[in-house]
């Protein structure tokens, strides 16, 4: 799946300032399956592209069923990954390094929907730019901030661990490592208090808790 950017320029009131809002659309690299088309399977020939476009067709699709949950996590990952990759590419082009990313860029996680920023930024720095974990995590924690808009625990996004690991296996690996390191620190602060440590952990009781993940990584 490819994320295609659409830039919308927004002018301010009574000022010369213009801001850019980037919207993303999901597309398949293969618009048409010519093999299926040649066999007369016209609907099937468009299936791959159609399924890719579904990801960004409706923002926040209903997730009261398993297919809706799968679609929503794919959508969140696409928007997060595309935005982060765009930010980092522009930063590299200008500064030739990502070492100074926290000094030049602030990435704000507004509620839990973009919380995948935490593991995805970590993944990009490690897998695509060759940072070791400690350096990557230092950059992540100094770049990301988080706002939570509710105190109701039922409104904080949680994913079934089985779904999360199936849809985002590499991201799941990184989340587990974040969780392992955090639990290790919590054990030093609250030795033996298993209930408190589980309550604060990003991964516990078969769930991946996005708010806890943000709190583990964000400096504000």
Describe the role of every protein-language-model region:
Residues 1-220:
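A conserved ligand/cofactor-binding region detector
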